[in-house]
Amino acid sequence: MSQVHRILNCRGTRIHAVADSPPDQQGPLVVLLHGFPESWYSWRHQIPALAGAGYRVVAIDQRGYGRSSKYRVQKAYRIKELVGDVVGVLDSYGAEQAFVVGHDWGAPVAWTFAWLHPDRCAGVVGISVPFAGRGVIGLPGSPFGERRPSDYHLELAGPGRVWYQDYFAVQDGIITEIEEDLRGWLLGLTYTVSGEGMMAATKAAVDAGVDLESMDPIDVIRAGPLCMAEGARLKDAFVYPETMPAWFTEADLDFYTGEFERSGFGGPLSFYHNIDNDWHDLADQQGKPLTPPALFIGGQYDVGTIWGAQAIERAHEVMPNYRGTHMIADVGHWIQQEAPEETNRLLLDFLGGLRP
């Protein structure tokens, strides 16, 4: 087994893919979809494990990232376009069906692919972000897109505060703060919402007498690092490690830094710009179940898992073939990187139970 870099033509969009497979080049296809601010490299621990278990594995750079196509027009980053890229990957490999696994922004793309194209989806796994219907990202009070995102974000953030997704959608402020120190910004964000960073923040809150157990979920969000005072920078709330964690090395940080030095953030941030557009585009799907076999993997300290608690609790209502929720202890947002062995075990158990 050896990893091969390929450029796929997915309905006119260039998609960079890193592929691996068993020696006989056979086996079910598994497509891996990364989130923000990441890369195919986010799946570096899963690619060999899945290929070694007999699957053809394809980890892509989503459009706007890495060596994949970049578009100036923001509407090119609507979720239906991202789902179209996944369909194009299957077509490039001549696959009628594939298993699709997504983390962070990759999870809504994976879920929506399964929702819109159930005949092409052998099974779907969302990591960190549960299925949220037309809402794309589940939040307390609007787990399945009951509210238009931009309206709800204002209420969620509260007076004088800004929800990070809206800050990202505007782009100017976030790009300015990133470009001041790209490498430092990536390290700060990564560590702040990791298990170590979130555990430290939780301990500090408890030591200060905060009763987190009794707090309203919205108050927890407002007190977190991704809800900002107006005029503040996101990185003002970052915490940094004294030494690099074992799961995220200097070499890993160098890789991500190099990718974004070349690609920039215009495309990735446009995913956030389109959240309202996605809500409108998926209106005709409202109330329709997601029918392929589905699994969710969350982290104890993961912000996406915490925000999506209502969507997770009610997953069986909207996914009749839901195979369960698995929570990994002591990890934060970067679940498959922080806990690769446990993630691989859960993926292989799920895929193995569905394999022809």
UniProtKB/Swiss-Prot annotation:
Domain AB hydrolase-1: 28-129
Keyword field: Detoxification, Hydrolase
Source taxon at top rank: Bacteria
Keyword RNA-binding among UniProt keywords: no
Location of the active site: D104, H333
Keyword Hydrolase: yes
Catalyses which reaction(s): an epoxide + H2O = an ethanediol
Site note Plays an orienting role for the imidazole group of His-333, residues: D302
Gene Ontology MF, one: protein homodimerization activity
InterPro entries associated with the record: AB_hydrolase_1, AB_hydrolase_fold, Epox_hydrolase-like
GO biological process annotation, one example: response to toxic substance
EC class name: hydrolase
EC code(s) of this entry: 3.3.2.10
Record-marked site positions (Contributes to the formation of an oxyanion binding site for the epoxide oxygen of substrate): Y164, Y272
Record Pfam families: Abhydrolase_1
SUPFAM superfamilies xref list: alpha/beta-Hydrolases (SSF53474)
Function: Could be involved in detoxification of extraneous host-cell epoxides. Catalyzes the hydrolysis of small aromatic epoxide-containing substrates such as trans-1,3-diphenylpropene oxide, trans and cis-stilbene oxide, and terpenoid epoxide.
Assembly notes: Homodimer.
Family (UniProt): Belongs to the AB hydrolase superfamily. Epoxide hydrolase family.
Protein name: Epoxide hydrolase B
Source species: Mycobacterium tuberculosis (strain CDC 1551 / Oshkosh)
